[in-house]
Design a protein with these regions (language model features):
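Short acidic, hydrophobic short linear motifs in intrinsically disordered regions
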Residues: 23-33
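Pre-recognition alpha-helix immediately N-terminal to the DNA-recognition helix
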Residues: 12-17
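A short, conserved structural fragment
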Residues: 52-62
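Amphipathic alpha-helical dimerization/coiled-coil segments
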Residues: 76-120
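Short, hydrophobic-biased segments on the C-terminal half of alpha helices
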Residues: 45-49
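Short helix-to-turn junction characteristic of helix-turn-helix DNA-binding domains
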Residues: 18-22
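Short, cationic-aromatic polyanion-contact patches
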Residues: 4-10, 62-80
């Protein structure tokens, strides 16, 4: 998959339609996109083709399925954000995030558990 995963909101909504219904026939995808996004068939196929070219989905034998899970996509998006915005420094990200939003004790405990698990 290409590194560039920057997407517009409509692409993301389209991806959610697929993730929530996969694997699905491309004709069913057109129906779902008409209902959920008010898209016409050509729009659905154009966006699908573009996201297939980016290695996120595949259309094989008329069936559409993801090549990466929603969780993997989120992980890659988060990693790219930290890399581009904070030069890859997770501590810098957490410092910036924590300075604007007060973390609850529960959130701090959860973060500490993640850090402790990474040390093992």
């Amino acid at each position: 998959m290409k590194k560039d995963l920057k997407l517009c909101e409509s692409d993301y909504r389209f991806m959610c339609v697929i993730w929530e219904n996969e694997p699905l026939p491309s004709g069913k995808l057109v129906e779902l996109c008409k209902e959920a996004l008010d898209w016409k068939k050509p729009t659905t196929y154009t966006v699908l083709r573009r996201l297939c070219e980016r290695g996120i989905f595949q259309k094989e034998g008329g069936t559409v399925r993801s090549l990466i899970s929603r969780e993997e996509f989120y992980a890659r998006q988060s990693e790219m954000f930290v890399e581009e915005t904070f030069h890859g420094s997770l501590p810098a990200f957490l410092t910036a995030f924590g300075s604007r939003k007060k973390l609850s004790d529960t959130e701090i405990d959860e973060l500490q558990k993640v850090i402790d698990a990474m040390r093992r």
